[in-house]
């Protein structure tokens, strides 16, 4: 564990899979993030431990980033700039955002974080396009690639059914 790095996720289940992981909401001290930017900032400033976390962390990892809304992304940027007293993007904090935007969407009908202008202007995206876990099973790789985009043809459906053990 390194105090300069915070490992967070958008859900509690995903956070348990990270070393010393917490939900982004818990780590950031933002609760449900209801209210405007100033209300959330006030909540963070009132908690010395949380405030110090924001001020000292150098790298913030956010897993399951596909569940992060554009609105929350922008609120967090505001909080980071104010608490860290730095007008750079996220107060100069480095972000490592992990996830697949074809998987879990933000809750409700909210916009994805990548739909924020702030995201588009400040985040470099890297597509990981090599499958390692199923590298010797090209048939299964093809099924996974199709399923990622919500496609399940008859041939693949039958193949998956044939692997059911009763």
Residue ranges: model-predicted function:
Residues 1-166:
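Conserved ATP-binding/catalytic motifs of P-loop helicase motor domains
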């Amino acid at each position: 564990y390194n105090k300069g790095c915070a490992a967070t996720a958008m859900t509690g289940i995903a956070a348990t899979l990270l070393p010393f992981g917490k939900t982004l909401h818990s780590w950031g001290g933002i609760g449900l993030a209801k209210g405007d930017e100033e209300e959330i900032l006030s909540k963070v400033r009132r908690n010395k431990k949380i405030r110090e976390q924001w001020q000292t962390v150098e790298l913030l990892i956010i897993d399951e980033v596909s569940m992060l809304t554009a609105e929350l992304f922008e609120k967090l940027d505001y909080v980071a700039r104010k608490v860290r007293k730095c007008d750079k993007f996220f107060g100069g904090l480095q972000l490592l955002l992990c996830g697949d935007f074809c998987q879990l969407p933000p809750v409700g009908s909210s916009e994805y974080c990548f739909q924020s202008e702030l995201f588009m202007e400040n985040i470099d995206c890297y597509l990981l396009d090599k499958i390692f876990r199923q590298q010797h099973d090209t048939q299964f790789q093809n099924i996974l690639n199709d399923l990622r985009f919500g496609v399940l043809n008859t041939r693949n459906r039958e193949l998956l059914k044939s692997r059911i053990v009763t």
